[in-house]
Amino acid sequence: WHTGSNKNIAMSILYRPQKDAKNLDGLTIKIAEILKQAMQENYNIKLTIKEPNDLMLNKKKICGILTESNTIGNKINYVIISIGFNVNEKEFPKELENIATSLYKETGKEFDKEKIIKILIKSLENII
């Protein structure tokens, strides 16, 4: 994954939900669905999901999602959700030009990263 200085979102969120481990089933896809819906509702941007963990825009990768979890018995100890989202990237390395994109490259506009982060976090509040 590639990110320019202060242009994109690269974040990890730690949850300690104290819930049953069965809530982890299909978690990455659930997160992708929620992020896809949030971008549609807030920006009218239609992303697609490429399993197992990517969001695509115009057949190019714009976002990647990774999850890591730890359980104790049948209870969730913690979940880490990591999201890399290409927001205001204007140029990609040559090897990524045909497979990666950003909101800026697709729309020609700069986006407020902090606003997007708030939307993503709010959207994920009840994920587990």
Name every feature range the model reports, one short phrase each.
Residues 49-51:
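Short loop/edge segments at beta-strand edges and connector loops
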Residues 1-19, 27-31:
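DPxDG-like acidic metal-binding loop motif
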Residues 19-47, 57-128:
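Long, positively charged amphipathic alpha-helical accessory segments at protein N-termini or as interdomain linkers
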